[in-house]
């Protein structure tokens, strides 16, 4: 694209491409993760019929619907800034200088080319995602139907199928968003993304329940069970994070160590993210008395969500060469986060206002 004859405003926009790309990826990933994670927990509750799922089912459904704008933020960012986010894409989309060595212009679709951004395989991956999304939409309609419409066995089968599809979607998201940027690939990226999304979505659901507990039916919420689930997810996420780091360094894998080397200047942010997301919740949830207190669980969930946001910034900002001390790195993030947060908040509250939030206490 000819940037040489641009105006001052155009030059400024060109300079802001990378900060907005990092911000859009971070905000979009946490929004998409919460949306898919809430769908997973909703399906799990429909499959098992557990008491916690019955009480939180409408909260989870509202969160799944309310955080759909996060999916649009992620898709819009990737669509508008593809060659900024994925440097390898310039070799296939006619943006790079084709006279340079090893540059391949956009041409005939070739399935024999194994490159990540070969248009043929890109279309195949996007087609798979569309099919999976359509499948989840159909199952969502099944789960939202009245009980007298679908047989319980069919509802459980639909929930199980939707859980599998959701995990597949999160795995594809982890590979495409984290491992498809031309950087070093960590072997546990799909599992990492699944744990990240499930922890963030569960924290959001518990936080919403804690804030709305004074409504009718809120007194009967199973707080000890919810605290135990948060503890379990914190431990799972901590294990996955630590095991990946330990395997990478102690096995001395240079290709994978470069992922952490590139983010060395952001190590302070990662430490803060892990402390908020894992350490503080673990220390608080160790005490049974605190696991039974809604206010304590709400504070823990706030820490988890803040830590998840900081971790999302650590995932993408170093790859764009951004400095953590520069104000220009954080301004796009704040703007997108506030905009998406307001839209999601209105969508979430609007979805909850149409019916009773919690079932009647028995």
Stretches with model-predicted labels:
Residues 33-146:
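Transmembrane-helix bundle segments that line or gate the permeation/cavity pathway
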Residues 22, 56-71, 153-160, 224-230, ...:
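Alpha-helical transmembrane segments and their helix-start/interface "positive-inside/aromatic belt" motifs
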Residues 33-42, 72-76, 126-138, 195-210, ...:
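Hydrophobic cores of alpha-helical transmembrane segments in multi-pass inner/ER membrane proteins
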Residues 21-26, 56-58, 182-194, 258-261, ...:
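Non-cytosolic membrane-interface motifs at loop->transmembrane helix junctions
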Residues 3-5, 10-14, 114-276, 287-290, ...:
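Long, contiguous internal "core" modules enriched in hydrophobic/ aromatic residues
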Residues 103-107, 277-279, 288-362:
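TerminUS-proximal long segments
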Residues 65-84, 232-240, 300-307:
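Hydrophobic alpha-helical membrane-insertion segments
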Residues 1-15, 87-115, 145, 149-153, ...:
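Extramembrane terminal tails and long inter-domain/linker segments of multi-pass membrane proteins
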């Amino acid at each position: 694209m000819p940037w040489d004859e641009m105006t001052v405003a155009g030059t400024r926009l060109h300079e802001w491409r990378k900060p907005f790309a990092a911000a859009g990826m971070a905000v979009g990933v946490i929004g998409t993760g919460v949306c898919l994670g809430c769908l997973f927990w909703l399906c799990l509750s429909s499959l098992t019929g557990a008491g916690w799922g019955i009480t939180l089912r409408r909260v989870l459904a509202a969160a799944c619907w309310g955080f759909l704008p996060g999916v649009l933020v992620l898709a819009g960012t990737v669509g508008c800034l593809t060659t900024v986010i994925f440097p390898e894409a310039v070799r296939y989309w006619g943006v790079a200088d084709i006279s340079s060595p090893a540059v391949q212009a956009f041409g005939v679709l070739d399935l024999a080319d194994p490159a990540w951004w070969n248009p043929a395989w890109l279309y195949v991956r996007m087609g798979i995602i569309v099919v999976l999304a359509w499948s989840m939409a159909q199952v969502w309609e099944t789960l939202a139907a009245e009980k007298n419409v679908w047989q319980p066995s069919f509802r459980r089968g639909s929930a199980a199928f939707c859980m599998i599809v959701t995990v597949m979607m999160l795995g594809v998201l982890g590979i495409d968003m984290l491992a498809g940027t031309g950087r070093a690939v960590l072997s546990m990226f799909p599992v990492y993304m699944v744990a990240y999304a499930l922890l963030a979505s569960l924290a959001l659901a518990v936080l919403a329940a804690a804030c709305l507990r004074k409504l009718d039916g809120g007194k009967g919420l199973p707080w000890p069970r919810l605290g135990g689930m948060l503890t379990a997810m914190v431990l799972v996420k901590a294990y996955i994070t630590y095991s990946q780091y330990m395997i990478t360094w102690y096995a001395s894998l240079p290709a994978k160590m470069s992922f952490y080397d590139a983010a060395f200047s952001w190590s302070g942010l990662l430490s803060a993210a892990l402390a908020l997301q894992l350490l503080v919740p673990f220390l608080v949830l160790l005490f049974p008395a605190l696991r039974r207190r809604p206010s304590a669980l709400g504070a823990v969930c706030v820490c988890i969500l803040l830590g998840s946001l900081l971790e999302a910034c650590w995932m993408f900002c170093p790859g764009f060469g951004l400095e953590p001390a520069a104000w220009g790195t954080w301004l796009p993030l704040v703007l997108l986060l506030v905009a998406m947060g307001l839209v999601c908040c209105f969508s979430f509250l609007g979805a909850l206002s149409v019916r009773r939030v919690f079932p009647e206490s028995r």
